[in-house]
Amino acid sequence: MNNSSTAKARPIKHILIILGRVVVIIAAVLAILAVCIYFMFLRYPNLKADPAVGKWYRVADSAMKDSEGNSYHALFKKGSENKVMIYFAGGGVSINEEMARDDTYNTHMVWPDLLANVTMNMGGLASDVDGSPFEDWTLILFPYATGDFHAGTGEFCYTDTDGKEKILYHNGYNNYTLAMQQIMQKAGIENADTVLVTGYSAGGFATALLSDDIYTNYFPGAENKNVLVDASLLCYSDWHD
């Protein structure tokens, strides 16, 4: 290469270096903005003592986990009225190895929190719609990610489609219990006068299974106790086995 060609190549190389640095800076700025947006708007803060009215929180514990063993959390918003709705999400069920292997249920949480909330409540009882009869109620939401009607306490070993040994964590009842205990300790809602336990699909089965536990252990003094099972149907001929 002669001196003339070398001289022409130097500015191009310099420009490429500058462009590369600009791209790196832009990527870093976008990453920082994404993190800020996530923690400021999309990820709810952890529940604290005496939570603010009308603000969403996540209710987490290290022992809470989804079907794959990853972290799980419930969602909470304190209302201005002395009324509480406990809402169980649906999303399939797993009762044997075939169903565990084929993922016939929600296997993990929807992230981030805001999306999980919107997805769970779109058009539902706990949605933030002006004029809703529940808009000023305290809301306790349980996303579904354990395939056990929110009522499991065990582990199920199975072989997946790739021949790998796996564990399905039926941890729904443990998640529910840990969340309820934390909420009752921090939120100041133990004297609610009206309580509604509800859920749809698989969450409807949770409603039927857990409502007695809720009214016995958490809201025994509520004057108005309600249970609403929504759209829950299970056709399985071997259920009695």
What are the functions of these language-model segments?
Residues 200-210:
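Glycine-rich nucleophile elbow surrounding the catalytic serine of serine-hydrolase chemistry
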Residues 36-53, 63, 155-156, 169-196, ...:
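Surface cap/lid and interfacial helix-loop subdomains adjacent to catalytic sites
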Residues 84-88, 138-143, 196-198, 226-230, ...:
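Structural recognition of the beta-strand scaffold that forms the well-ordered cores
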Residues 93-95, 148-149, 204-206, 233-238:
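Flexible loop/turn segments at secondary-structure boundaries
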Residues 55-57, 68-69, 118-126, 209-210:
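Short amphipathic alpha-helical surface micro-motifs
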Residues 63, 77-182, 186:
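Active-site machinery of serine-nucleophile hydrolases
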